[in-house]
Amino acid sequence: MPNPNTADYLVNPNFRTSKGGSLSPTPEAFNDTRVAAPATLRMMGKQSGPRNDQQQAPLMPPADIKQGKEQAAQRQNDASRPNGAVELRQFHRRSLGDWEFLETVGAGSMGKVKLVKHRQTKEICVIKIVNRASKAYLHKQHSLPSPKNESEILERQKRLEKEIARDKRTVREASLGQILYHPHICRLFEMCTMSNHFYMLFEYVSGGQLLDYIIQHGSLKEHHARKFARGIASALQYLHANNIVHRDLKIENIMISSSGEIKIIDFGLSNIFDYRKQLHTFCGSLYFAAPELLKAQPYTGPEVDIWSFGIVLYVLVCGKVPFDDENSSILHEKIKKGKVDYPSHLSIEVISLLTRMIVVDPLRRATLKNVVEHPWMNRGYDFKAPSYVPNRVPLTPEMIDSQVLKEMYRLEFIDDIEDTRRSLIRLVTEKEYIQLSQEYWDKLSNAKGLSSSLNNNYLNSTAQQTLIQNHITSNPSQSGYNEPDSNFEDPTLAYHPLLSIYHLVSEMVARKLAKLQRRQALALQAQAQQRQQQQQVALGTKVALNNNSPDIMTKMRSPQKEVVPNPGIFQVPAIGTSGTSNNTNTSNKPPLHVMVPPKLTIPEQAHTSPTSRKSSDIHTELNGVLKSTPVPVSGEYQQRSASPVVGEHQEKNTIGGIFRRISQSGQSQHPTRQQEPLPEREPPTYMSKSNEISIKVPKSHSRTISDYIPSARRYPSYVPNSVDVKQKPAKNTTIAPPIRSVSQKQNSDLPALPQNAELIVQKQRQKLLQENLDKLQINDNDNNNVNAVVDGINNDNSDHYLSVPKGRKLHPSARAKSVGHARRESLKFTRPPIPAALPPSDMTNDNGFLGEANKERYNPVSSNFSTVPEDSTTYSNDTNNRLTSVYSQELTEKQILEEASKAPPGSMPSIDYPKSMFLKGFFSVQTTSSKPLPIVRHNIISVLTRMNIDFKEVKGGFICVQQRPSIETAAVPVITTTGVGLDSGKAMDLQNSLDSQLSSSYHSTASSASRNSSIKRQGSYKRGQNNIPLTPLATNTHQRNSSIPMSPNYGNQSNGTSGELSSMSLDYVQQQDDILTTSRAQNINNVNGQTEQTNTSGIKERPPIKFEIHIVKVRIVGLAGVHFKKVSGNTWLYKELASYILKELNL
C-alpha cells in the first residue's frame, strides 16, 4: 500500500509541492522526455528513495524534447493564473490487498461501491470507496493562488473545517459499522484509509434493494410486510439500545438477502444520541424525513427513526409513499401537516399502527416499544421481535478494561484513553447508576431463583461471579433481561453513549478473541495430526525396512509413497497382530495398516441431501488395534471409501487428483493400474476358505468403471476366468495392502475387517428391513425375497438405492466432478418415501449385470449391450405392480404428510430440491397449489401411475416417458391399466383421443428416418463412452412401467424406457447435453439393437413422448407450482397429455 505521506496518485511524477503551497514543475521536467506518464513505483509506495530518472526505462514512447519544454513552460504559465489550475487525474485502483475489484454496483456524489472477490478464499464482498473530502480540498487549494487578505483566509479555513467534518462522518460510519453486530444490519468488516480515498469492506447482500423489490412486485401482502417490518424493528431496537440513531431510514437503504431477510445499510448520517441532550443536525431524505427536521426543531433521535419506519411500512403495504408532490414546497407542507390517506384494502390493525407512527407531534408519536408490542407486529408469531442485544452486566470501576479503551481510541471514538477512563469511572459511580445496578441484580437474582439479594460487594463473591459469567454467556432470547419494562430502567441499555460504545467495543473484542482462539486451536490440532502422521509413517517405514521379505517390500512400498505427501490420510499405528490365524503366518509378516471406520452407523449421503454430515463426524477418533483373525464380511464393505467432502478437498490440493480426473475416461484400457490408498477406508475382506461368501456367483460380467457412474462405492466385479473367490491362498503368502484395478478383480490376499463389523451392519440392515416390512405389510413370500436381497447384495455391481445405507463414504475418484458440473446420475437416485425402502425382488438376480456372457441384449439402463437375464422382465413387472398398488391407494392428506414426515432426508428429491422462482404472472391457478409439497408430489405420482406413464423421480421433479401403441392396434393386445381410480374405459378414451390427433403421415418411413438421423447427430455430442453404463440398474425400481407387453419381443424389454430416462435430467440440475444421446428412441423394442422403425410383426412404432415435470416453489406467495417441459415427441400429443395431467392433478 502506498504511504499517504510520501505518495500521491498524480499523473506526472515530476510535479512536486513547492514551499509556497502551489504546484510547479521541477527542472528535471525539462530534461525528461516523458511528458505524461502513468503512476510510477514511487506513487504506489514501492520506492521510498529518490528516483533515478536515467536508470529507469521510459514508460511511454519518447517525445520531442523541444515540444516537451514548450508544454512545461505553458503549464508553468497556467499555474500562475487563478483559473489555470493544473488538472490532476486520479489513480484508479483495480485491487486492494487480496481483494480484486470486479465491477461497480453503485455510484453517488460521495463515491462508489464495487464488487470484490478474494484471491484465495474466493469470497465475495463489496467495497465502498469514499473520497477523502479534506484531501481533495487541499489538492484543489494547492493549485490556487495564495489568499490576498484575512477574510479570504478565514473563508478557506471555514471550508476546510466543513470538509474535515465530512471525513469525520465517514470515519464515524466505518467505526460504528465495525462494532455493530446484528442479523438485520449489514456487516462492515474492515476500513482502509489511503491517500485519497477511504475503502470500507462490507458484507455482500445479494438480493438487491427493497426499492427494486417494491417496484417489481408492487404492494406486499400484510403477512409478508410484517416479516420485513419485524426485521426493521429488531435492528432499530438494537441501535437505540446502544444510543445510536440512523437518521436516514428509507427503502433505498434496506437490502434483501438471498434468504429473504432484510439488511439495513448506509450509516453515513447516523449519530450517537443521549436522552439528556438534543441533536441539531437536520438531515435525511425528504420523503422519509420527520416534520421536526423540516421545521429545524431540536430532537432527541429515536423519534425521527420511528417516523421513517412508519413511512417505510406504509410503502410496503400500499406500494407508494404517503406524501408526494412535484413541487418541493408543497411536499414540505404536506409532510408538516401529516395528513395521510389509507387505502381501503388495509386491515384495521395496520391502520392503527400507522396512525400511531406517522404523527407530526414527536411527543405523541409511538415509541419503539409501542411498535414492537403492537398486535399487528406479532400476529402469527409467538414472540416479539428480538433486539439481539447480548447479555450485559452493569459496570464497576474495577471492570473497565484498558484493552477495550485502546480499541475505542483506535476506532476514533475517543481522543484520550485516560480521560475516557475517568469519565467512565465517574459514570459508573453515580448514585443513579448504582441504584439501577442494584435493581438489576435483584431482578436477575429473582429470575435465577436466588433467595438472597445482592449487596454492594456482590462482585467479590464467588457465587455472584458465577452468576455473572453464566448470565453473560446465556442466550439473550432466553434470559429476558433486556425486555422492555415500564417499571424498570436497564443500566446496560442506552444509559449513556459512552457506556454503550464501551459495551459494543468490548463485545467486538470478545468476538475477535474467540475467533483467534478457534484459529489457534485448529492450527494446533493440524500440527498435532501432522506430527502423529509423521510418526506413523516413520514407524511403518522402519518396520518395512527391517523386514527381509521382498514380496512385502514390493507391496508396501507403493502405498507408503502415496501416504507421505497427503496430510488428509490418518492411519492407526501399526501394531503386531496375533498369530492365531490359520491362513497367515504372522511370525515374519509386518503389521497391517488398516483403518477402522469411525462410525458403523450409516448416515445419509452427503451429496444427495442438504442435511449432510459434518466434517467433525467424519474425522472422529480412530480405534487402535485390529484383530488379525479374518472374519466373513459382506462384500459391500470391501471397498469403503472416504467422505466426498474429504475426497474433494484432497483432490483439489494434489497433483494426483488432477491426473485421476483426467484418466477417468481411459481407465478401462488399463485393467491392472493401481490406485492410491483411500482416506478413512476399510480394506477389502480377506478371502479364505474359512470365510467363504455365502452367496453363489453363478454368472460373471465385466464392467468398466466410468466417471459417469454415480457409484458411492464400487463393488468388485467378477470377471470370467478371474481369481476364484473361494480360492485358498498360499500358506506363506502375506497380506498386502488393498489393490484396486479398473476391472475390480477379487484379490485373495486382502486384510480383514474388524470382527464386530458384520454384526453391527447386519443388525442395522435387519432393523431397516423390519421397519419397512412392518410399514408395507409384505407377506411371507416377499420376506423371503428381501432376505435374498440382503444375502445377495455382495454380488450386486449396480448401486441399488433402495438398499444402500445412508451416508456411505465415497472414494475421491468416484465422486462427482464438482457442484457446478455434477453428474446427472448422482443427482437422480434417491429413495421414494411412501414405499419407504421396499427392496425389489429383481435385485436378487441383478437384472442383467450378472447374466450369462453369451446372452447379450440391449440394456437401455446402461446404454450398451450388457447381459440381461431372461427372467428380468418378471421381476421388473412385479416391482412395478407393487409400486402401483402403493401409489394408487386413496390416501388422505394427513396420511400423506405423515408418510412424508417419516421419510429420511433426501428420499424425496423432487421436493427436497425445488426450483425457486420469483416470476410474477408465470404461473396460473391451474399450475399452482397451496397444498404442501408432499401432497403435490403424491398426486403427481398417482396420476402418472394411473395413466401408465413411465417416470423417474429426480432432483426437482420427474422425467416421464409416454409409450404409445403402434398404429395397427388390432395386431397388438390393448394396453390395460393397473391403477386404481382410472377405469379401462377412461383410459381408452384418453388413448383414442390421443391417437386421433396423430396423422398417418407423421409415421411415414421418410419422417421416421429423418428423425432417426437427427437423433443420431445429437448423439455425436455425448460426453460418454461406449460400453459404459450411465446409470446403475437400480433405476428400474424408481420408474413406472406397468404396461402389459405388446409383443414377446417387447415383453423381454419391459424396462426399455429406463435407458431413455437415464439419459435425461432437469436442465437446472445438471449442465450436460441430456436431450437424446443415441437413437435409442427407435430401438427400445428391438432386441438386437438394430435401428429399425418396425418390430418383428411389421408394425410401425410410434415414437414415445418424453417430457419433464418440474416442481417449482414460488417465493413470497408461498405456493407450489408445476412446470412441464417437452423433451421429444409429437408436440400436439404432448400438449394434450400435459393438459390431461393438469386436469387430473386438480391443483
Curated annotation (Swiss-Prot):
<feature type="region of interest" description="Disordered">
    <location>
        <begin position="572"/>
        <end position="591"/>
    </location>
</feature>
<keyword id="KW-0963">Cytoplasm</keyword>
<keyword id="KW-0418">Kinase</keyword>
<keyword id="KW-0597">Phosphoprotein</keyword>
<feature type="domain" description="Protein kinase">
    <location>
        <begin position="99"/>
        <end position="377"/>
    </location>
</feature>
<dbReference type="InterPro" id="IPR000719">
    <property type="entry name" value="Prot_kinase_dom"/>
</dbReference>
<feature type="region of interest" description="Disordered">
    <location>
        <begin position="1001"/>
        <end position="1061"/>
    </location>
</feature>
<dbReference type="GO" id="GO:0005524">
    <property type="term" value="F:ATP binding"/>
</dbReference>
<dbReference type="GO" id="GO:0005886">
    <property type="term" value="C:plasma membrane"/>
</dbReference>
<keyword id="KW-0547">Nucleotide-binding</keyword>
<dbReference type="GO" id="GO:0045921">
    <property type="term" value="P:positive regulation of exocytosis"/>
</dbReference>
<feature type="domain" description="KA1">
    <location>
        <begin position="1098"/>
        <end position="1147"/>
    </location>
</feature>
<protein>
    <recommendedName>
        <fullName>Serine/threonine-protein kinase KIN2</fullName>
        <ecNumber>2.7.11.1</ecNumber>
    </recommendedName>
</protein>
<feature type="modified residue" description="Phosphoserine">
    <location>
        <position position="609"/>
    </location>
</feature>
<feature type="compositionally biased region" description="Low complexity">
    <location>
        <begin position="1001"/>
        <end position="1013"/>
    </location>
</feature>
<dbReference type="GO" id="GO:0005935">
    <property type="term" value="C:cellular bud neck"/>
</dbReference>
<feature type="compositionally biased region" description="Low complexity">
    <location>
        <begin position="576"/>
        <end position="588"/>
    </location>
</feature>
<keyword id="KW-0067">ATP-binding</keyword>
<dbReference type="InterPro" id="IPR011009">
    <property type="entry name" value="Kinase-like_dom_sf"/>
</dbReference>
<dbReference type="InterPro" id="IPR008271">
    <property type="entry name" value="Ser/Thr_kinase_AS"/>
</dbReference>
<feature type="binding site">
    <location>
        <position position="128"/>
    </location>
    <ligand>
        <name>ATP</name>
    </ligand>
</feature>
<feature type="region of interest" description="Disordered">
    <location>
        <begin position="860"/>
        <end position="882"/>
    </location>
</feature>
<dbReference type="Pfam" id="PF02149">
    <property type="entry name" value="KA1"/>
</dbReference>
<feature type="modified residue" description="Phosphoserine">
    <location>
        <position position="549"/>
    </location>
</feature>
<feature type="active site" description="Proton acceptor">
    <location>
        <position position="248"/>
    </location>
</feature>
<dbReference type="GO" id="GO:0106310">
    <property type="term" value="F:protein serine kinase activity"/>
</dbReference>
<feature type="modified residue" description="Phosphoserine">
    <location>
        <position position="888"/>
    </location>
</feature>
<keyword id="KW-1003">Cell membrane</keyword>
<feature type="compositionally biased region" description="Polar residues">
    <location>
        <begin position="14"/>
        <end position="25"/>
    </location>
</feature>
<keyword id="KW-0268">Exocytosis</keyword>
<feature type="modified residue" description="Phosphoserine">
    <location>
        <position position="22"/>
    </location>
</feature>
<feature type="region of interest" description="Disordered">
    <location>
        <begin position="629"/>
        <end position="687"/>
    </location>
</feature>
<comment type="subunit">
    <text>Interacts with SEC9 and SRO7.</text>
</comment>
<feature type="modified residue" description="Phosphoserine">
    <location>
        <position position="146"/>
    </location>
</feature>
<feature type="region of interest" description="Disordered">
    <location>
        <begin position="730"/>
        <end position="749"/>
    </location>
</feature>
<dbReference type="GO" id="GO:0006887">
    <property type="term" value="P:exocytosis"/>
</dbReference>
<dbReference type="GO" id="GO:0005934">
    <property type="term" value="C:cellular bud tip"/>
</dbReference>
<dbReference type="GO" id="GO:0004674">
    <property type="term" value="F:protein serine/threonine kinase activity"/>
</dbReference>
<keyword id="KW-0472">Membrane</keyword>
<feature type="compositionally biased region" description="Polar residues">
    <location>
        <begin position="1023"/>
        <end position="1061"/>
    </location>
</feature>
<dbReference type="InterPro" id="IPR028375">
    <property type="entry name" value="KA1/Ssp2_C"/>
</dbReference>
<keyword id="KW-0808">Transferase</keyword>
